[in-house]
Every structure is written in structure tokens, then in C-alpha cells.
A protein has these predicted regions:
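A hydrophobic C-terminal alpha-helical subdomain
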Residues: 246-319
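N-terminal glycine-rich "phosphate-gripper" loop used for MgATP/nucleotide binding
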Residues: 81-90
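Conserved Rossmann-fold cofactor-binding substructure of NAD(P)-dependent oxidoreductases
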Residues: 55-74
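Short, amphipathic alpha-helical "lid/cap" segments that border enzyme active or binding sites
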Residues: 68, 188-196, 298-306
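N-terminal Rossmann-like NAD(P) cofactor-binding module of classical short-chain dehydrogenase/reductase
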Residues: 71, 75-80, 105
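Oxidoreductase cofactor-interface core, primarily capturing Rossmann-like NAD(P)-dependent enzymes
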Residues: 2-51, 62-65, 86-87, 99, ...
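ADP-ribose/adenylate-binding Rossmann-like module
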Residues: 95, 100-111
Length: 319
């Protein structure tokens, strides 16, 4: 794509701005101010919570006409829809292509779905189907796509809401497969900055996977940082719960046979993908340098832990 075309990429539509990931993407665009942002919402009941200068359009995700109308004139579609709404993304992609949207960034922001083991997990079937749809649609149109993989979202994983690694209320830290394996992890703020950076590097990020991380760290290293942050708070010592991700996957498969994608099913496959060796959770290559993502060190991770453990941090993650 020529440079003069990239300079004309200005109008961005964001779906899912009220969710946790979407709220951080929204914040990044508000800080950036180089792009004109439009929010796609199911209803306008919480419109007062959005910045007044941002356009908000109510859409019907079951109506192609509604989606195409909302996306006309948009250069970029960013989806931050949560797992409960992932089935809507196929219609969003069809509408974006019909509206001649130049770049489509779907709701990924997680596991490395280029890993063949992780790619087989049934909980990622909708995302993989959408990736295939994007590849086909963009090959036959003027649209392009970017898939953003972040592996484990650090603030979510250590929050009371996520509880993937830490259960703060029980003073419990979960160690998967011994806890010595390094895994890639990314903060929610960096997810937002990455989306903006992808548009700033429009040509270099077209029709490809982007992998970013704030740090590659072991769970044991993270546990030590949690202990340092909480050392003076007067609380009890941290307990450790050892979990085998192979067992978690087995339990997820057994639960899946009962016919429902329950939280236990999602959890079992998620921890296997994020923390088990050989499942792509420790990125072999990252695109941080291309996008200007600097990453964070021990002190910054400790500041993040301190914030997430605070009342303000818990409230920010309560979407």
C-alpha cells in the first residue's frame, strides 16, 4: 500500500468499546487523537459514559444493512467484542468488506492461534473460522486485515475478575506445570497502544499476524513480584496451588462432552494455550520493535500489580 493512502486512513469504527479490552482500545485512541473514532453499540443507554467528541452509532448486529450503513466512510474496523458476541464478527466482516473498509482488526488479543496444538482447541473455533473468512474476503476485495496476538493479558490474569493466576481474596497464586516456563504477557494498556500502532504502520501490518508482549516471564518470577508488592500489607502468606494444564485440558474435554461451552471448558483450554510448553504461549518472535512497543521491566510490573490490587484497579477491570 502506498504511503499517500496510509496518510488518508483517518476514520476508525470500534465495536465492543464497553468491554474490558475495548475500553483500553478506546482510551488509546482518545490519547492519540490522530484518528476519528466512531463507536458501534447495540444500544445507547450508556452513551453518557463515552467522551462527548466521539460519534456513537447504534447498530443491529443481526442486520447486514444496519452494519453496512454504519461502516460506510470508515477506513478501519476494530472489533473488541467479547466471547459472548464473537458469533457476530462474521457479519461484521461481511459488512466491512461491502462498505470498502480498508483494514479489519478482529477480536483476538490472546492465544497464539498459529500454533497447531492450540489451533485445535474447540473454544477457538469461532476465531479460527473468522481468520479463514478474513483471508478469503480480503484476497477478493480492497480490504486487508491484521490479527493481534498478545497471549496472557497480565492485568486481567492477576485481577479478582480474571483470577487466572491470582485469587487475591484467598491470597492464592496458581502455578501451572511447575511455574518455571516463561510465557508472553501483555497489559491491557499495551493492547490499546498496539491497535493504534498497527494503523500507524498500515502497510507493514497488512494481512498478517502481529505478536506483541510487554514481558516474557515465568509464573514463579511473577509470584515473587506479587510477594514483594504485598510484603508490607499485613496480610497472610501467599498459598500456592499447583495445576497441571494437561489435567485441566482433560477436564475441559470431559465437560465439553456434556454439550456446553462452560467456564470450566474455556478455562482448561486457555491455561493450556497460555502456559504449557509447546503451545505457543511464549512467542518465538515479537513485533514490538516494528510497532514501537517497549515492553516493561520488573519495577513496571510491580506498579501494575499494585494498581490491579488497588480498589481503583479492581473497579477499572469490572466491566
Amino acid at each position: 500500500m502506498k504511503e499517500d493512502l496510509r496518510s488518508r486512513i483517518k476514520n476508525v469504527a470500534l465495536a465492543g468499546a464497553t468491554g474490558i479490552v475495548g475500553s483500553y482500545i478506546l482510551a488509546a485512541f482518545c490519547q492519540n487523537k490522530r484518528y476519528n473514532l466512531t463507536l458501534l453499540v447495540r444500544d445507547k443507554s450508556n452513551i453518557a459514559s463515552f467522551p462527548p467528541h466521539i460519534t456513537v452509532i447504534q447498530v443491529d448486529y443481526d442486520s447486514n444493512e444496519s452494519l453496512v450503513s454504519a461502516l460506510r466512510g470508515q477506513d478501519v474496523l476494530v472489533s473488541a467484542l467479547g466471547k459472548a458476541a464473537l458469533h457476530c464478527q462474521g457479519r461484521l466482516v461481511d459488512a466491512a468488506v461491502a462498505a470498502n473498509v480498508r483494514r479489519i482488526i478482529p477480536s483476538e488479543f490472546g492465544a497464539n492461534l498459529r500454533n497447531p496444538k492450540t489451533r485445535k482447541f474447540p473454544t477457538y473455533a469461532l476465531k479460527i473460522s473468522l481468520e479463514n473468512q478474513l483471508a478469503r474476503s480480503c484476497e477478493l476485495s480492497n480490504s486487508s486485515y491484521t490479527l493481534i496476538y498478545t497471549n496472557c493479558l497480565l492485568d486481567w490474569a492477576i485481577s479478582s475478575r480474571g483470577a487466572l493466576l491470582v485469587d487475591q481474596s484467598k491470597r492464592l497464586f496458581k502455578l501451572y506445570d511447575g511455574g518455571n516456563n516463561k510465557f508472553s504477557t501483555t497489559s491491557l494498556a499495551t493492547v490499546g497502544h498496539t491497535v493504534v500502532a498497527v494503523l500507524d504502520h498500515f502497510e507493514a501490518t497488512a494481512n498478517r499476524v502481529i505478536c506483541v508482549q510487554d514481558a516474557a516471564i515465568s509464573q514463579i518470577e511473577l509470584l515473587e513480584l506479587v510477594k514483594e508488592v504485598t510484603a508490607g500489607d499485613g496480610g497472610q502468606e501467599w498459598d500456592v496451588l499447583h495445576i497441571d494444564t494437561g489435567d485441566a485440558e482433560t477436564r475441559a474435554l470431559a465437560a465439553l462432552k456434556q454439550g456446553a461451552l462452560t467456564s470450566e471448558v474455556f478455562y482448561g483450554f486457555a491455561v493450556r494455550a497460555a502456559f504449557a510448553p509447546g503451545y505457543g504461549g511464549h512467542f518465538a518472535h515479537c513485533d514490538n520493535e516494528l510497532l514501537g512497543i517497549k515492553g516493561i521491566g520488573r519495577d513496571e510490573i510491580k506498579r501494575l500489580i499494585r494498581h490491579v490490587f488497588s480498589e481503583d484497579g479492581q473497579q477499572a477491570l469490572s466491566h
